[in-house]
Amino acid sequence: MNSSDEEKQLQLITSLKEQAIGEYEDLRAENQKTKEKCDKIRQERDEAVKKLEEFQKISHMVIEEVNFMQNHLEIEKTCRESAEALATKLNKENKTLKRISMLYMAKLGPDVITEEINIDDEDSTTDTDGAAETCVSVQCQKQIKELRDQIVSVQEEKKILAIELENLKSKLVEVIEEVNKVKQEKAVLNSEVLEQRKVLEKCNRVSMLAVEEYEEMQVNLELEKDLRKKAESFAQEMFIEQNKLKRQSHLLLQSSVPDQQLSKALDENAKLTQQLEEERIQHQQKVKELKEQLENETLHKEIHNLKQQLELLEEDKKELELKYQNSEEKARNLKHSVDELQKRVNQSENSVPPPPPPPPPLPPPPPNPIRSFMSMIRKRSHPSGSGAKKEKATQPETPEEVTDLKRQAVEEMMDRIKKGVHLRPVNQTARPKTKPESSKGCESAVDELKGILASQ
């Protein structure tokens, strides 16, 4: 019952360990996927930040150009105003010169006076519209035209720059929105990573608890094994003492008044029984060891014999293949000779030739020197009745015959042991050999789990 419970507990621990390892691997894969997504989002964010920085640089450049153009425009405005002021001054000077000239012309006649009056009327109108009039000189007109053209071009450039500024502002808004989205996605990914880390920590705790439980169970199992061995040895000693007491009581009952010789005989008998029991135990241990050695030796011998049989079978196969090829060649030759004879028969229908001689018999197969050499070695190594058995085993046999031979050998060996030695019952000695293998497998699995936990 204890062994079955321990096996169940070990199976449960192994299943829990496998589940924990599977969950750990899934979580690791998900963590790698999230890391890859996070790296991609980081790259996109870095690209967006670079684009934003480029847009900021371009916007700063545009703003600097606009400021430069505005300064240039203000300078041109001041130049135009100064040119207009010069034009008004020149106009006034021209008017004063005209008046002076007209005064000088008044001395000439009335016609000149009428012209002067007309000039005065024109002066009254030109005083009101002096700012709008153009300069009479060619240089002023050229400067004004150039300034107007520059103003128009500057206004057009200003409009273009304003449109570009609006576009850049819209792009900036889009980039800011993308950055905010990336930040939100990053926050979501960080939360998922934290959750996965928590789950991983839980799995690690569960696996650590499983490992601790396994170690405790292993320690308990070893303690139970030691206690069982001690109990068996104690039970054996008690059994020996009980047998001693039974014999002594039986002898005491037979003789109501025991003598000294009888007591000595009883003591000697008890000592002899004790020695016999000890020798029996030692003999049983030796028999166990010899049995294990014999099993190992028989297995090695069987493997060696099977290998030799394989080699011999391969050699026989090669010989048979050669014989088959030779027989095929002979059959071809015979067919060819039959065809030739048939042709001859057809040619000479009248004259019947005597029948051809029969083909010579096939030569016997050549003896195999390797097989004979191996049989000689076996005869020398096993010179008794076992030699005949080994020679039979060297011949190619079926697996059923091999198993029968094994069974016979084991039965003979057991009969010899039984005749010479009284063995223990089967329940005490026969123990399942699969347990240590399963425990070794569990130990290796637990060691792997410990290594995984240590690597983290």
UniProtKB/Swiss-Prot annotation:
The keyword Membrane does not apply. Residues 343-405, 418-445 are annotated as: Disordered. One of its GO terms (molecular function) is actin filament binding. Involved in the generation of internal asymmetric signals required for neuronal polarization and neurite outgrowth. Mediates netrin-1-induced F-actin-substrate coupling or 'clutch engagement' within the axon growth cone through activation of CDC42, RAC1 and PAK1-dependent signaling pathway, thereby converting the F-actin retrograde flow into traction forces, concomitantly with filopodium extension and axon outgrowth. Plays a role in cytoskeletal organization by regulating the subcellular localization of phosphoinositide 3-kinase (PI3K) activity at the axonal growth cone. It comes from Pongo abelii. Belongs to the shootin family. It is found in: Perikaryon; Cell projection, Axon; Cell projection, Growth cone; Cytoplasm, Cytoskeleton. The modification Phosphoserine is found at residues 3-4, 101, 249, 375. This is Shootin-1. The N-terminus region is necessary for interaction with actin retrograde filament flow and accumulation in neuronal growth cones. Keywords: Acetylation, Cell projection, Coiled coil, Cytoplasm, Cytoskeleton, Developmental protein, Phosphoprotein. Interacts with L1CAM; this interaction occurs in axonal growth cones. Interacts with actin filament retrograde flow; this interaction is enhanced in a netrin-1- and PAK1-dependent manner and promotes F-actin-substrate coupling and concomitant formation of traction forces at axonal growth cones. Interacts with RUFY3. Interacts with PFN2. Interacts (via N-terminus) with KIF20B; this interaction is direct and promotes the association of SHTN1 to microtubules in primary neurons. Associates with microtubule. InterPro entries: Shootin-1. One of its GO terms (cellular component) is microtubule cytoskeleton.
